[in-house]
From Swiss-Prot:
NCBIfam families noted in UniProt: rplA_bact
Ribosomal protein recorded as keyword: yes
GO MF assignments: rRNA binding; structural constituent of ribosome; tRNA binding
Domain of life: Bacteria
UniProt organism field: Borreliella burgdorferi (strain ATCC 35210 / DSM 4680 / CIP 102532 / B31) (Borrelia burgdorferi)
PROSITE patterns: RIBOSOMAL_L1
One BP term from GO: translation
Protein's name according to its UniProt entry: Large ribosomal subunit protein uL1
C-alpha cells in the first residue's frame, strides 16, 4: 500500500473490503472514487473454482459497445477474399500478408482465416500466438462464414478465457458510460461465463467477482449466479 499514490490510498479507504456490493452500488462507488483525468476502462475479475482439466473460453458481443473499432485481418483466397473485402475486413490477403507479418508488421487487432488457409497461417503460430491472435474455431475465427464472423467482430465480439489460476479478466465498459449500460454489460458477461460451467464440476463455480477502473481499487460484487 505504501507504494501507492495519495489519491489511490484515499480511494481505497472508501471501499469496504469486507462488503459485497450489489452491482448498482459498486458502479456508483467506482465513479465516486475515480480520480484519473482520462476516461478509464472498467474491468471485471472473476475467480472460478476450476480443476486442472477444465477450460473456460468463449467469445461475447456485449449489448453496449465502448471500444474503438477493431482492425480485422482476414486470410483468404479467391472468392472468399472478395467476400471478406465486401463485408468490410480491414486487410485481406494470403501469402503477402503472411510475409508482411513475418517482417514485423502488426497493425491489426484480430485475425480471421478460412479453413483452407490454416496450414499456411500456422507458420505464424509463434507470432500470432504470442499476441493471442491465432485463429481458432472455438472463437469463430476459423470459418467459411466470413459475413457473420466479420459482422460480429465489427459489433465488438471479444474473446474471454480463464487463465491457469482460474481467473477471467475482462474489460466491459468505460467510466463515462451511463450506469445502466455498464450494468447491462456486466450482467451479460457474467451470464455468459456461467454458461461455461464444466458439467462435472461440484460445488460453486464462481468464487468471487471484483470490478475496478484502470487506476482505482477493486470492489467486491455480490452475485447470485453459482
Amino acid at each position: 500500500m505504501s507504494k501507492k499514490g495519495k489519491k489511490y490510498i484515499e480511494a481505497f479507504s472508501k471501499v469496504d473490503k469486507n462488503k459485497f456490493y450489489n452491482i448498482e452500488d459498486a458502479i456508483l462507488l467506482l465513479k465516486e472514487i475515480k480520480f484519473a483525468k482520462f476516461d478509464e476502462t472498467i474491468d471485471i475479475s472473476i475467480n472460478l473454482n476450476l480443476k486442472k482439466n477444465h477450460t473456460v473460453r468463449d467469445t461475447i458481443v456485449l449489448p453496449n459497445q465502448f471500444m474503438k473499432p477493431k482492425r480485422i485481418l482476414v486470410f483468404a483466397k479467391g472468392d472468399r477474399a472478395d467476400e471478406a473485402r465486401a463485408f468490410g475486413a480491414t486487410y485481406v490477403g494470403d501469402d503477402d500478408l503472411i510475409n508482411k507479418i513475418k517482417s514485423g508488421w502488426d497493425e491489426f487487432d484480430v485475425v480471421v482465416a478460412t479453413p483452407d488457409m490454416m496450414k499456411d497461417v500456422g507458420r505464424l503460430g509463434p507470432i500470432l500466438g504470442k499476441r493471442g491472435l491465432m485463429p481458432n474455431p472455438k472463437t469463430q475465427t476459423v470459418t467459411n462464414n466470413l459475413k457473420d464472423a466479420i459482422n460480429s467482430l465489427k459489433k465488438g465480439r471479444t474473446e474471454f478465457r480463464a487463465n491457469k489460476n482460474g481467473v477471467i479478466s475482462f474489460s466491459f465498459g468505460k467510466s463515462s458510460m451511463d450506469n445502466e449500460k455498464i450494468k447491462e454489460n456486466y450482467e451479460e458477461f457474467v451470464k455468459e461465463v456461467v454458461k461455461k460451467r464444466p458439467s462435472d464440476l461440484k460445488g460453486a463455480f464462481i468464487d468471487s467477482i471484483y470490478i475496478s477502473s484502470t487506476m482505482g481499487p477493486s470492489i467486491k460484487v455480490n452475485f447470485v449466479w453459482r
